[in-house]
Amino acid sequence: MADSVLFISWGESIPGREERGLEVFNEAIGLYGRMQQDGRIESFNVVLLAPNGDLGGYFEIQGSAEQLAAVRQDEEFRRVLTDAQLIVKQMRIIDGSTGEGIARDVALYQEAIAKVPQTA
């Protein structure tokens, strides 16, 4: 069961690079689909957002922490991200938790706040 996520988001396309942007978007979907079929990730979601002047959309890749660490080192994954960074603004790649990873991270947080004096 997935306990970790990679959240990959992007903003607006750089003007004049929209066609290449669509190509790279489709390459990413194909790559993540192959990774899922090969068992290298558990699943992925694609979300396109309504125009808002900031966030255009995101991929959410789910898997174990070990799977996602391997994904980050995958040459094809890195190539797709490099291509994407040249055609969109505000690209972000953020690690996160899901499933059992939430309980693990909440436990760490509870442990940390126990060490901090609480004030009203």
Task: Describe every region a protein language model picked out.
Residues M1-L55, G63-Q73, I93-A120:
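Short S/T/G/P-rich N-terminal loop/turn motif that feeds into the first structured element of a domain
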Residues E60-K89:
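Mid-chain, well-packed structural core segment of small domains
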